[in-house]
Every structure is written in C-alpha cells, then in structure tokens.
C-alpha cells in the first residue's frame, strides 16, 4: 500500500484538534474527507512506526488491527508545524511531486525550506529587519 501524504497531513491535523490530555481517538471510528478506512489505518500505523504519534496497536482475534491514538510526539508536532500552512503545503507538494518517491523526512525538510524562503522574502521587504535577523543568526547580540 502507498502512503498518501495528504492523508498524513489531515490525520495529524485531526489528532491535534481532537485529542486532548487523557483522551484518545480510535482510528476505526475516525472519518476524514475522502480517505478510506484502509488509508487511515495504514497512515496511522506508519505514523506510529515513524515516531510521529503515540498510539497503541492491537492485533485482534478476528485478524483486524485496532489503533488508539493518544497524542502527537515532539517529532510529530515539528513535522506538522512544517506542513500546517496551506500555502506551504501546496508549494511543498508541487516540489515533491516531481519525484516518484519521497520520504516524510524529506517532505518535512522541503517544507522547512519553503518556510525559510517565504521568511527570507518577507525579510527582504524590511531591510533593517533582514540585517537584524542575519546578525542575530551569526550570534551577534549587539544589533542596536
């Protein structure tokens, strides 16, 4: 089965929105957009394997698999923060679509580069702010 990056993003957004402290969601009872239950189950399993979510995976006697999701991990939050913005996500998808296979780690790195490019573009509109950002990045604390 192929991992659907849109399903990954939508599931992470759903987990962040719906799962509170001391709560969980069962992937079997989760419905998101146009994704099949198999897509959601496969995505949840892969996110758990990758360390992006805290989940309990149970192999049931009838041969089915149950996944209870308790939270995003620190890495899950970092990944979601990189791909949350719709404009960033759209640009990231257009870049990675040019390749036949791209890991979630690469998707996250591309999204981070897209964000940095957008920040750099914004900083270019304010030269003084750009100078301060550059100097502080070099470790210079005497900006003023």
Where are the model-predicted features located?
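Short, amphipathic alpha-helical interaction segments positioned at domain boundaries
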Residues: 64-95
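Short amphipathic alpha-helical interaction segments
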Residues: 33-50, 66-67
């Amino acid at each position: 089965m192929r991992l659907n990056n849109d399903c990954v993003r939508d599931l992470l957004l759903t987990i962040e929105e719906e799962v509170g402290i001391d709560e969980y969601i069962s992937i079997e009872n989760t419905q998101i957009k146009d994704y099949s239950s198999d897509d959601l189950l496969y995505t949840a399993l892969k996110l758990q394997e990758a360390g992006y979510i805290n989940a309990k995976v149970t192999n049931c006697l009838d041969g089915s698999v149950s996944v209870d999701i308790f939270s995003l991990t620190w890495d899950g939050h970092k990944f979601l923060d990189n791909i949350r913005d719709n404009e960033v996500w759209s640009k990231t998808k257009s870049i990675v679509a040019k390749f036949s296979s791209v890991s979630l780690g690469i998707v996250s790195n591309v999204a981070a580069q897209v964000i940095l490019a957008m920040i750099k573009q914004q900083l270019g509109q304010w030269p003084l702010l750009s100078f301060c950002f550059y100097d502080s990045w070099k470790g210079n604390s005497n900006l003023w």
